[in-house]
Swiss-Prot record:
Pathway(s): Isoprenoid biosynthesis; isopentenyl diphosphate biosynthesis via DXP pathway; isopentenyl diphosphate from 1-deoxy-D-xylulose 5-phosphate: step 5/6
A molecular function (GO) term: 4-hydroxy-3-methylbut-2-enyl-diphosphate synthase activity (flavodoxin)
Descriptive protein name: 4-hydroxy-3-methylbut-2-en-1-yl diphosphate synthase (flavodoxin)
EC category name: oxidoreductase
EC number of the protein: 1.17.7.3
UniProt keyword Iron present: yes
Tree of life domain: Bacteria
Role this protein plays: Converts 2C-methyl-D-erythritol 2,4-cyclodiphosphate (ME-2,4cPP) into 1-hydroxy-2-methyl-2-(E)-butenyl 4-diphosphate.
Entry keyword Metal-binding: yes
Binding site for [4Fe-4S] cluster: 315, 318, 361, 368
Length: 431
């Protein structure tokens, strides 16, 4: 057997590249402040799919998204009825104790809606403007300016969100004409990327000329192809220091949408690009809207960028694990942990860092369980019908019988109270 040559230097330490420096935007509602950019952690946001004119239905969905962990929630403002409902939505949320900032999503007629409904303009914490459909020709500059002036008047930050499906056609024609003059013209993909970036940066600079501080501007350039999104944001990050909103538009449904969004965003986040993310999933019929929030959180948490909820480590199963017990227990514990987080995150600071291992056999079960804060190694096929439990690397007991799931959940609860509750009590006593 050939021996490998020893190396003198240690392996490179894992981790993302340093975050790209950007100006920090501040999005407020009441006492709630969400910073996007600067040294703030990457922010998770989402969008409702209700009819905004239905104030009660929209407020209920915003509440669910916020309780799941969305730090900003965007709502469509597309009609006078929707604009008129925004103050009622905000009021209803405030009554429910939900202070998540609301972002108004405007297309085509945003300038008029904000002008005709000042209460809407005030109730929103941020505006999203699409420079591709704010108006055509001379009207474009006037209507864009009207929206920016409203943002300045009420002190609201703005996301200038460019989308390849609604790109400013006049600008695209200009970029194509410039490309035709090159000795070696770019291909169509490069022209499209250049048009997206140019639209975003030129619009941002115009907004600054009107009076909106650059620190209150967030940019996005969304496309639906993974490699195009990566290329667009790499170049956009190189050319400006505005905060950046990441998202793969029209990512799709189910596993395809999750995989595509993860493939694109994880590359950019690993390179230090991105200040806020939204996962644009097409929901399955009847599926909860909160799925997009959970996916966004799991991307950030699995990359080690932020922690939101205790994570369950579980093996995939194999011929040694013909029983479904460990699968059912893993799903049950993960659901339980997420359900508890709205209460735990205030009562037990740091609990979001906890790892729980639910393993299916003796091969990796005990070892993986020892590395977690709490771990259980369930018996595989042909193994003794016993499940050793490990706490902080030490075997504390062995569970048997029909109530393994219930008994393990009690151990998890006790660990949270004794470890994270003690830390909270100590911090309170020190104040």
């Amino acid at each position: 057997m050939q021996m490998t040559t020893p190396v003198d230097c240690a392996p490179a330490l894992p981790g993302p590249l340093p975050r790209r420096h950007s100006r920090a935007a501040e999005i407020r509602w009441g006492e709630r402040l969400v910073r996007v950019g600067g040294d703030a952690p990457v922010c998770v946001q989402s969008m409702t799919n209700t009819d905004t004119a239905d104030a009660i239905g929209t407020a209920i969905q915003v509440k669910e998204l916020a309780r799941t962990g969305s730090e900003l929630v965007r709502i469509t403002v597309n009609t006078p009825e929707a604009a008129a409902a925004v103050p009622a939505i905000r009021e209803q949320l405030d009554r429910m104790g939900i202070d998540v900032p609301l972002v108004g999503d405007f297309h085509y007629n945003g300038h008029k809606l904000l002008q005709d409904h000042p209460a809407c303009a005030e109730a929103l914490s941020k505006y999203r403007i699409n420079p591709g459909n704010v108006g055509q020709g001379a009207k474009r500059d006037t209507q864009f300016a009207q929206m920016i002036e409203t943002a300045c008047r009420y002190g609201k930050p703005v996301r200038i969100g460019v989308n390849w499906g609604s790109l400013d056609q006049d600008l695209l024609a200009r970029i194509m004409d410039e490309n035709a003059q090159r000795a070696a013209p770019w291909d169509a993909r490069a022209v499209m990327i250049e048009a997206l970036i140019t639209s975003a940066i030129e619009s941002a600079r115009k907004a600054e000329e009107i009076g909106l501080p650059g620190s209150q501007i967030i940019l996005s350039c969304k496309v639906s192809a993974v490699q195009d999104l990566i290329a667009v944001y790499r170049e956009l990050a190189r050319r400006c220091d505005y905060a950046l909103h990441l998202g793969l538009t029209e990512a799709g449904m189910g596993s395809k949408g999750i995989v595509a969004s993860t493939a694109a965003l994880s590359v950019l986040l690993q390179e230090g690009i991105g200040d806020t993310i939204r996962i644009s999933l097409t929901p399955e019929p009847g599926a909860p809207r909160e799925k997009e929030v959970i996916v966004a959180q799991e991307i950030l948490q699995t990359m080690g960028l932020r922690n939101f909820t205790p994570m369950v480590i579980a093996c995939p199963g194999c011929g040694r694990t013909t029983s479904t017990v460990f699968q059912e227990l893993a799903a049950r514990i993960q659901s339980y942990l997420r359900e508890q987080m709205p209460v735990w995150k205030t009562q037990y600071p740091g609990v979001e860092d906890m790892n729980v291992a639910v393993m299916g056999c003796i091969v990796n079960g005990p070892g993986e369980s020892k590395h977690a804060n709490i771990g259980i190694s369930l018996p595989g096929t042909g193994e003794s019908p016993a499940a050793p439990v490990f706490v902080d690397g030490v075997k504390v007991k062995t569970l048997r019988g029909e109530r393994i799931a219930e008994d393990f959940q009690v151990i998890v609860d006790e660990y949270v109270r004794t470890h994270y509750g003690a830390a909270q009590a100590k911090a309170t006593a020190a104040e």
